[in-house]
Amino acid sequence: MTAAFDGPPLLVANAPDAPDWRPDLRTIPDVRPGLGSLGGIYTAVVEAPAPVVCVAWDMPFVPEPLLRRLGAGLREHDAFLPQSGGRRGVEPLCAAYGPACRDAIAQSLEEGDLRAIAFHARIGVGILPLSEVGRFGDPELLFFNVNTADDLEHTDEMWRRLESSPSSGGRTPERPR
């Protein structure tokens, strides 16, 4: 993400040892703990000095050019999300959020609606169509979440395939440390 935005990312994490994960990053806990993913998005919007592009920690295959494209979408929208084949149809944990999202998210949190897309009706949301997302890679791979030991093992296999694939053209995302 540093390469995508000319500055270090902000790590929003609640684990007591989170600052040890990446000591080179500013790490902050949720400003309103216990509110799930929406609470994390809210924290990023509140704490960052500018609009933010959020990427879930467990999405290792999101490439820099996609992050840049999402950030560019904020020129015309309050939030900009990639379309996906997931259950929501969009990926709110790999998306760009502008300052207008702050109050809209706060209202959803106050109402107890913790869905990551709960505040979308209150702001101008843009969607990066799946056809354009596909230009950055296979959406299923791009938005793959690592939630279990099996997922982690599968991730290692996918990294090896990506790194050895001639079709990647050297465009594989930076491999996590």
Protein language model regions, located:
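Nucleotide and nucleotide-moiety/phosphate-recognizing core
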Residues: 1-113, 117, 121-142, 153, ...
